[in-house]
Amino acid sequence: MCGNNYKKFFKSVLIVLLAVPAVSQAQSSYTPGNGCLNVVSLTSGFGLCDYEIQCSSLNYMHEKFLNENLTIGAGVGYSYHKQYRLSTIPVYVSTHFFLFDKRCSPFINLRLGSFGMIRKKSTDTNLKYSLADEQSDFNLFFSIGAGFKYHITPRIALMASVSDDFYLLKAYDTRRNDYRNKLLGNLCLGIAISFQIDNW
């Protein structure tokens, strides 16, 4: 039952993305010469099937245009993981690919980097949502997302997306009764504003 709901959810997202009109005005999208792409996003993860970890995040990305459709740069964020009572600061390389150079366009966003932990309250309790007091030497973070943008001016756009955010953490494994490295996923819905500023 849970698997069917999961498939229906992604089918609905795919239909929305494919239904975005790609024939909007050509001159109302970003112009690479007008500055870098800045994105401020707010995401919220919710428990769904195997994605039972709830997570809320605030992120800022600053990316350079390689052409009209592709950007790459760096980002930083703040995330709170509810079940683990954990706060993290992810730092990453980020890229956006916009399918159309139009006012309204689907896009893909990829992020890869690491994260620091600034607060963890559930450690060494040998419970399901417990973290090891000593973590791995490298904390891997990566995310893949898709969504669409809509320009309200040539330099400002609103964005909506769904993403899969992963954090590599040494967490308690209830099947093995031990702390092991686990890739914890968060299925997130996000809204964002993106903008260009001259020389920034």
Question: What does each model-found stretch correspond to?
Answer:
Residues 61-142, 150-156, 189-200:
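Gram-negative (and chloroplast) outer-membrane scaffold detector with strong preference
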Residues 42-44, 76-78, 163-166:
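Generic short beta-strand segments
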Residues 1-32, 197-200:
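Cleavable N-terminal export/targeting peptides
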Residues 41-45, 126-132, 173-176:
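Extracytoplasmic loops and strand-loop junctions of Gram-negative outer membrane beta-barrel proteins
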Residues 150-200:
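Predominantly the C-terminal beta-signal and adjacent terminal strand-loop region
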Residues 25-72, 188-200:
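Short glycine/proline- and aromatic-enriched beta-strand/turn motifs that initiate or cap beta-hairpins
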